[in-house]
Amino acid sequence: MLTFRELKKLAKSEVEGPEYKVAVLGNVATQFFSLGIKGYLKSEGINANVLDTDYNQIDAQLLDTDSETYKLNPDVVILYIATDKIYEEFLDLNVVLRESFAEDYCKKIVNYWNLISNNSNSKIIQTNFTEIDDRAFGNYSAKVKDSFIFQIRKLNYLLEEKMSERKNVFALDLLSIQIRMGLNQFYDNVLYYNAKMAVTMDAVPYIAKNVTDIIKTFRGSFKKGIILDLDNTLWGGVIGDDGLGGIEIGELKRGHVFSDFQRWLKSLKDRGILLCVCSKNNEDTAKEPF
């Protein structure tokens, strides 16, 4: 993983090839986020032109057809709507209105998509929402409809449903990044309140890489196959030495790991990813476990 310092340097580098234009719109500060994306795209040989729009100006950018976003005519528009900011909107609502917060906010985001689609040919990358549990209801938050944790989880679900209906909208899964990194590594209260940044500097490269991976698929660059060894990869042990009865596979001990790995590989196969084998075993020996 590249560091932010490395990404900052890469963002200034020259890359040959046609320009790839990206507009970043957010309800929080996105300067470092945009810089990280530009650096990561250039590290992959993509001549990126990244427009970082002003703080919390999504409506102004999308409603005005003469805005800098539309003038750029971007290949991709990134909508970075941070949980921290909409949490403030949630708290400002009358308690009676909080139960419909997820539905109402989902409609607002879908309207953003419509504006972009009606005024450009841009693809849309939409962030989902990380979780903030204010503990106002404690563990009951998961069953109380007017709690923020209930509404933010519902909003993520509603967004997933809506994105599945739109061919030009793609998810940037911030929640998964938060879970992998851990809340304290992903988010810093001090940074948010002082600089309106919704993620730490350590998190920026991870997010930028995910954006880059999405954009690479737009450009036709993605993994089409996996080449695997057999021994101690698809099963534990060496089939040529241990024999069919001696390799580790199944529900017991290490065998469980290999069984689950095979299940995951099968899910990739079901997606159309080619599974290939490269093994030093004799062909007949290698085929025994199959």
Describe the predicted segments one by one.
Residues P18-L35, D231-L234:
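Catalytic nucleophile-elbow at a beta strand-turn-alpha helix junction centered on a G-D-S/GDSL motif
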Residues K224-I239:
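Asp-based phosphoryl-transfer active-site loop
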Residues M1-E16:
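Short N-terminal or domain-adjacent regulatory/targeting segments
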Residues I239-L265:
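Basic, amphipathic juxtamembrane/active-site segments
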Residues G236-E248, S279, E283-F290:
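Metal-dependent catalytic core segments for phosphate chemistry
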Residues V24-L25, T127, C278:
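Short hydrophobic segments within beta-strands
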Residues K12-E19, S34-M201, K209-K224:
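Alpha-helical cap/lid subdomain in secreted, periplasmic
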Residues H256, D260-F290:
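Substrate-recognition element of Asp-dependent hydrolases with the DxDx(T/V) motif
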